[in-house]
């Protein structure tokens, strides 16, 4: 099961019949809506399609609204695009004009006041570089330094220049409120520079009584420098390498990416690595070797999610791009040693919830558990378990559909819904039954369950239990690590053994001695109430290489003749064989 999540940007390419369905079935976890393009009505049509499909397929695909942010973009060209030649003059204007080979309108009216002669302006993530020659109240006259084709709405960056524009525009506020109304799960906040930017968005969400989570997009040096304070306010981070690679020396991007991922993992916040991950698949059905390595390295670094942009929004092969991401992630994860799995706590003292989550992960590793089941009211426990990166499958059992979708972004979590429980025992059994019915665990699996007492109170996770799916009939100490199965032959005396034992039975007795040796040789396994590891049962079991469990308290009373069971010496348990 893939632990790294996949974020896919929706657009014209995903509007084609059947494409969105195939993307979901191929592994898309989060649908990203880029509000730098499109209208509210266009986004609503796509969101409604996501809602309908996730309901039909029972897949917790989250919806992420990516804000326009305090960005500067070109407006429209008369013919949709122009070709700029090195050395030519080109003017950026605040006037409302259709663009051509000589000029184009921009979205930020104060840019002529913010730049000066000699400044560099980059278009379309640096595809074309301009040098400012002079400015007027409404225009910036430039020289084109390199040739390139420029299209509508491409980004405008001014490296090293602090723009005077406010963080949140009215358009962004309207978009966020639209997102609240339509039930989006995440806001990807563009161009976050400091914690105050996150708080500004949080105030809008709080006023609207919304639980939408905020992912801070780090795209410039100011955001990188303030990452620690941003992480304290945001619910997660996106390594937005497109504008970052324009605003910052591109040779620094790999180190910045690694550091950002490490900081996010250490504090338990999800981190999305984005931009040009499989860029060649916009046009080609297969990625380059460099792109495969880029995706894999982000996963090796510990990224929570990997993102597709133009590959799915406007590419020729959106479904293939998702399948490629999924395949790279699965193969890469198979090469990562998660046997101890946990990331050390970033500080000496943890909260009770975090400490319980950490203990659940280490317990699962110690006993070789098949899964960790985390029952969480608000998703906090599930987030903490995700933080410690266990090798075992992590099933997050939740009561709220939106929180279930939000957990779909977190590393390693498989979020499912469960019914509310009134007691601890009921909660544990309900969690196991729900996960088993979903096909995530099976009869005989060993699971670690973590939840809170009292039941149903958010933030009270303080309980860990180790459970066997299906329940063990008896427990004891296994001799060796073999397994066996067969019908039970429960006897309290040697005479009873002689009267009813048949070869291949699982022999259950209070103790053994040499009188029972012939029967022990022909038994599939032996279960004894005898406690001593140096006693007759254990010694004979080792000599005969026979599956043996000793110290099975009241086994002759609790087990019933003829029931077919499995005996697992490595775990010291006896279970009914599933039908």
Q: Predicted regions span which residues?
A:
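Protease-associated
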Residues: 350-358, 362-364, 466-519
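Structural preference for beta-strand elements that scaffold enzyme active sites
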Residues: 5-7, 30-32, 60-64, 89, ...
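Conserved alpha/beta-domain cores
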Residues: 8-12, 42, 161, 166-275, ...
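Short beta-alpha connecting loops at secondary-structure transitions
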Residues: 244-246, 277-291, 304-316, 341-346, ...
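Expand to "…catalyze enediolate/carbanion chemistry for C-C bond making/breaking, isomerization
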Residues: 1-12, 16-17, 24, 39-44, ...
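C-terminal helical cap(s) of enzyme catalytic domains, especially alpha/beta-barrels
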Residues: 44-50, 202, 312-335, 465-467
